[in-house]
Amino acid sequence: MNSYIYALGFFDGVHLGHQALLDAVKKLALPGARGVVTFLNHPDTLVLGQTPGLINTPQDRELLLKHYGMDKIVALPFDKKTQTTPWRDFLEDLLEHHGAAGFVCGEDFRFGARGAGNARLLAEFCREKGLPFAIVPEQTLGGSRISSTRIRKLLDDGDMEQAVACMGHPYILTGTVVHGHQLGRTLGIPTANLAFPKGLATPRFGVYGCTTCIDGKTYLAVTNLGTRPTVDGHHITVEPWILDYSGDLYGQTVTLEFRTFLRPERKFESLTELKTAIQANAQQLREQGKDFSGFLGARP
């Protein structure tokens, strides 16, 4: 069994605070021995009886963790067994079954039954076992702690720029392009259509400036996230108009990188008025996006 230094946490958003943990792992472990232990479902589902809307799908979270250099991702179910496992047994299990050879956590990290495990006890455990470890202080931006909760609020407010600043990377959303009403094509604005994943925190409805990588090339995308009130106004959809791209994306997986909030979603009096607004958004994005480069690059 290979050995790994593991960062511990849920890592929703993989924000700058999480990246500080990943950086600590990279200082302790050589490439090939860097890992993360996280959970398939949010602990609050059992601990508090409620599930917060998440920033990332599990697939996008894994994509980000790998982007930041993690070689192994252990995603455990947070179930009754996990919830009632004593903190020491939890660490021992990682040593025995997952090749753990050291740990990294944040200074406020709690784990084990009743949250009895903490950073101090983890440090004592590692000293006792002769294992390397690191306890990472919280990260702040603008004098306030960076947290997934803070980022969810920023997304809800439509403050994409500040959310991106807290994450240290764009807000990403991956989906498979499906057939839509093809209204955009009749307007000369062909859009791809993606379903908004269930269980995610919903950013403010509106039009966003995004980047996306297709066949190794980065494109700008004017993206409507909302219910399309001018057309039908029911289901949440994600519709990027990928500028200067003319290929067929049906059935393909696309990762959108949200960079900036262009305007709130609104109902227009006519499709002509809608088209004019979208074209204005495209010009706005071309100006703002001159310095944007693709974040993730080609999807593996």
What role is predicted for each listed range?
Residues V36, A75, I135-V136:
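A structural preference for short, hydrophobic beta-strand core positions in alpha/beta folds
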Residues G180-P300:
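Phosphate/ribose-recognition catalytic cores of enzymes acting on nucleotide-derived substrates
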Residues C126-G226:
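Glycine-rich, Lys/Arg-enriched anion-binding loops that position phosphate/diphosphate groups
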